[in-house]
């Protein structure tokens, strides 16, 4: 065996200045043991052995291959053991010597929100090497060393996209995530990031053109991509990386004269503050390879690059097989007529929402018609003013507005014991991976754009039943989608199915808890909160569930403390800030509520529920113009939400624009004909405009939707009296009196008016 001059003065066994084959063999054996421990998830063992390897190789020259490999394995072990700060410090010093070290440094920077600029510079330098088809010897050595967890080009681009998003550079983040998808169409987190930025991708190209090519390439290289593993000499699986395709002149021989990773033109730029502008520039080779552009509309939610040069460079820097379109929500806000067309195309639900929304958060079940009555505020109304019973009933539902996630009705079977027939095997199981991923991507895009009807239709028509019924992601999405359109019964069934599949699940439980809050189900809410407190006491979702339970018990101060605990555990948890703001609003603390809503928007600019909260706070203060701006901003993010549309109409009504407000209410009724809120608001406005015949028709439809609501019957009876239908008026007012005995005085006054009529 040839002696490596780098190890000549080094002996592992005794530490004396001599070198033999045994020393090199021990180094390799340590590397294999570390990687085997990592593969077996024995991270403590990996960290201990990596410390030994790091210490023993510390006397080598810092340009040594064995030294850089030792640093990488040590940093990787620390990172996997969640010692992020130590891994960050170790990898920071040597990030320019090794691809893997630079990758770990970037991961730590993302995790800790430290050194993000420096990490971007380093990763850009590495990607530039690959983009220029460089035959850099050190990189080829890393790629051919079979080291565990060496990233491929798609992963590097995904990490770069996440780092740019950490800096609120949406345009650059979208570019690198699109690059990642162009290389690996199944890198789901990149597509999730793109949807979160409300960008669009040509999904057919991604999942059929690119995926087809990758599938053929994978079949041709399967044997070489996955070498056999031996316990005696551990050989981790090599990543099926595209680097081997990029580096066509790759050299498998180790060149002992190569001492640095980046040489001459490949050396990384300086990491000083003045050099950060280089982050804004893409490599020349990337621009030459790209033909597709990112188009960004100017808006407050989309961050624009600080360096103007990035605009022109990014515009021509997208891969050929992907099309991106970063769009401002406000720039795509449809008109009233166009929204109606969208609804007609996407109308699907067989079980439409039928919840009457109110501040008292009440929920009652009717066994005859399955409609829910949430309007019991009039129970405490003893005023003689005829308008009090109307003004007492409000329909604001802050918690069903969220930005950020069941048993099915047709089956009571345990999903683990599903029996699959031959017909299902031939139909449902015949779907290909690109097809199922394409459909999932369509669903995620529709969901991120709040097109809930379309997403539900895609689930029903495109996703095989065995996947839809047993995959937690599908159950979560369906639960969220039905929750978003206020179809609480269906949402509850999907979340119940999810809890059956994963009883210890904590992710997305804050949405389930809010659903139970709307249904006024204290028992299930208590069981959920207590169960999570026993198993996951340090999760922010747990404290959101506790906060919702306390809010349900009318203990708003304790609920605020619970939501504060959630934000302490996760300072970027936008939904927790919003829920905290709702509690402050319930305590009439408008300033504190606004502060919480603004914190939520700082975490997530697309969190439309926070804009809704700001709007309701402004309405309470009589600032109707400001409220309208906030509601319109929320509607620009979620243009088909009937609650937001009604809020816009309410603001316009307060400002005296009744005709315009009526258009909003009509739009809400058209988008969701079963929305009791929109029917109530439109009927009340028509009544105030003395359009009694149209108002009468609207109130009749409202009574059909909520037959157990006293206010609906009262309004209908009052309108009957005005149009001269005395007998019908007495009938409806009598029903209202029976449903709401505490509101008798107001109803009695109206009955007296009926009897005074001829």
Curated annotation (Swiss-Prot):
PTM statement from Swiss-Prot or TrEMBL: Phosphorylated by CDC28, which is required for the early mitotic activity of the APC/C in its CDC20-bound form.
Cited PROSITE patterns: TPR, TPR_REGION
**Region of interest (Disordered), ranges:** 218-333, 350-392
Q: Give the free-text miscellaneous remark of the entry.
A: Present with 593 molecules/cell in log phase SD medium.
Q: What does this protein do?
A: Component of the anaphase promoting complex/cyclosome (APC/C), a cell cycle-regulated E3 ubiquitin-protein ligase complex that controls progression through mitosis and the G1 phase of the cell cycle. The APC/C is thought to confer substrate specificity and, in the presence of ubiquitin-conjugating E2 enzymes, it catalyzes the formation of protein-ubiquitin conjugates that are subsequently degraded by the 26S proteasome.
Give the matching PANTHER family: CELL DIVISION CYCLE 16,23,27, CELL DIVISION CYCLE PROTEIN 27 HOMOLOG
Q: What protein does this entry describe? A: Anaphase-promoting complex subunit CDC27
Q: Which organism is it from?
A: Saccharomyces cerevisiae (strain ATCC 204508 / S288c) (Baker's yeast)
């Amino acid at each position: 065996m040839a002696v490596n001059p780098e190890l000549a003065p080094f002996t592992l066994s005794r530490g004396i200045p001599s070198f033999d084959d045994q020393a090199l063999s021990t180094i390799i054996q340590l590397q294999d043991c570390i990687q085997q421990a990592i593969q077996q998830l024995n991270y403590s063992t990996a960290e201990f052995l990596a410390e030994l390897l790091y210490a023993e190789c510390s006397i080598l020259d810092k340009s040594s291959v064995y030294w850089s490999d030792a640093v990488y394995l040590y940093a990787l072990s620390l990172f996997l053991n969640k010692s992020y700060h130590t891994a960050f410090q170790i990898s920071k010093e040597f990030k320019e010597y090794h691809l893997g070290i630079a990758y770990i440094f970037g991961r730590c920077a993302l995790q800790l929100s430290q050194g993000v600029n420096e990490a971007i510079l380093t990763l850009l330098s590495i990607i530039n090497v690959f983009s220029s088809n460089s035959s850099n010897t050190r990189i080829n050595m890393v790629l051919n060393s079979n080291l565990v967890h060496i990233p491929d080009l798609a992963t590097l681009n995904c990490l770069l996209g996440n780092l740019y998003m950490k800096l609120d550079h949406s345009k650059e983040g979208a570019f690198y995530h699109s690059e990642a998808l162009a290389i690996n169409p199944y890198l789901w987190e990149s597509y999730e990031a793109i949807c979160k930025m409300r960008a669009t991708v040509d999904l057919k190209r991604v999942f059929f053109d690119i995926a087809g090519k990758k599938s053929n390439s994978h079949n041709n290289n399967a044997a070489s991509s996955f070498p056999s593993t031996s316990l005696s000499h551990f050989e981790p699986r090599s990543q099926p990386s595209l680097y081997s395709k990029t580096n066509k002149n790759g050299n498998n021989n180790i060149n002992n004269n190569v001492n640095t990773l980046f040489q001459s033109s490949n050396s990384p730029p300086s990491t000083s503050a003045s050099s950060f502008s280089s982050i804004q520039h893409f490599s020349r080779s990337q621009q030459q390879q790209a033909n597709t552009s990112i188009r960004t509309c100017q808006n407050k939610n989309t961050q624009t690059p600080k360096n103007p040069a990035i605009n022109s460079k990014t515009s021509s820097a997208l891969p050929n097989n992907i099309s991106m379109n970063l769009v401002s929500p406000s720039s795509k806000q449809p008109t009233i007529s166009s929204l109606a067309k969208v609804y007609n195309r996407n109308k699907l639900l067989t079980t439409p929402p039928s919840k009457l929304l109110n501040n008292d958060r009440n929920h009652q079940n009717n066994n005859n018609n399955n409609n829910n009555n949430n309007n019991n505020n009039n129970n405490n109304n003893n005023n003689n003013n005829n308008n009090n019973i109307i003004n007492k009933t409000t329909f604001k539902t802050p918690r069903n507005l969220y930005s950020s996630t069941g048993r099915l009705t047709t089956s009571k079977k345990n999903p683990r014991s599903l029996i699959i027939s031959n017909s299902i095997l031939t139909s449902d199981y015949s779907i290909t991976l690109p097809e199922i991923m394409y459909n999932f991507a369509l669903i995620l895009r529709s969901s991120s754009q709040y097109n809930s009807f379309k997403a539900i239709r895609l689930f029903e028509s495109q996703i095989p039943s065995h996947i839809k019924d047993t995959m937690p992601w599908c159950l979560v999405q369906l639960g969220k989608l039905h929750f978003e359109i206020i179809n609480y019964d269906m949402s509850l069934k999907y979340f119940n199915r999810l809890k059956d599949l994963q009883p210890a699940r904590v992710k997305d439980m804050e949405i389930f808890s809010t659903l139970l809050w709307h249904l006024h189900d204290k028992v299930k809410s208590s069981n959920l909160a207590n169960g999570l407190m026993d198993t996951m006491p340090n999760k922010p979702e747990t404290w959101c569930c506790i906060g919702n339970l306390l809010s349900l018990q009318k203990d708003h101060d304790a609920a605020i403390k619970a939501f504060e605990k959630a934000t302490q555990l996760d300072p970027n948890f936008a939904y927790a800030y919003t829920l905290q703001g709702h509690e402050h609003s319930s305590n009439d603390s408008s300033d504190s509520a606004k502060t919480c809503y603004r914190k939520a928007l700082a975490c997530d600019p697309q969190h439309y529920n926070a804009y809704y909260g700001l709007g309701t706070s402004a309405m309470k203060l009589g600032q109707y113009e400001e409220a309208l701006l906030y509601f319109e901003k929320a509607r620009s993010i979620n243009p088909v939400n009937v609650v937001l549309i009604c809020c816009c109409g309410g603001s316009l009504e307060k400002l005296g624009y009744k005709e315009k407000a009526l258009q909003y209410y009509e739009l809400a009724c058209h988008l969701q004909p079963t929305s009791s809120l929109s029917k109530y608001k439109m009927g009340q406005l028509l009544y105030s405009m003395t359009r009694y015949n149209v108002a009468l028709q609207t109130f009749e439809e409202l009574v059909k939707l909520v037959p157990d609501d006293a206010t609906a019957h009262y309004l209908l009876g009052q309108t009957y009296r005005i149009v001269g239908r005395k007998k019908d008026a007495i009938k409806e007012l009598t029903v209202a009196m029976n449903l709401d005995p505490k509101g008798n005085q107001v109803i009695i006054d109206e009955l007296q008016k009926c009897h005074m009529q001829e």
